[in-house]
């Protein structure tokens, strides 16, 4: 016979059954005219920047733009268990504050992946940022 209570407790303590909670921050101006299909397709198919989660359960907890009150958004992500924030590929390519946004996310304790779809190096040679949250 299997004691499911012990099995569940074991998996919780060892990280089994854990779902990695992810959020995506998109460039505010781009979001006004983009359906975000590239970001969502990459997430759903676990390709490009999301390939690293191929063998993990993931949940997309937040998907919003980086404008407005970013501190409030980060607090909401934290409250909802997000551990990793992906900055959209358009943020890397079109937002002058890309590096600052990445650092702000890391300072709030999140791991940061600096792109969503396409390559880690953009067509114009810009390399995606990868940061580990500072409070870890």
Descriptions of predicted regions:
Residues 1-17:
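Short, Lys/Arg-enriched N-terminal segments with co-localized hydrophobic residues
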Residues 80:
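Active-site charged/polar residues at nucleotide-handling catalytic sites that mediate phosphoryl
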Residues 100, 104-136:
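Ser/Thr/Gly-rich flexible loops in soluble cytosolic domains mediating phosphotransfer, phosphorylation
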Residues 7, 59-61, 111:
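Flanking helices and flexible, charged tails adjoining ferredoxin-like Fe-S electron-transfer domains
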Residues 83-84:
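Structural motif
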Residues 18-77, 88-97, 118, 127-128, ...:
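Conserved mixed alpha/beta catalytic, RNA-binding, or beta-rich assembly cores of soluble enzyme
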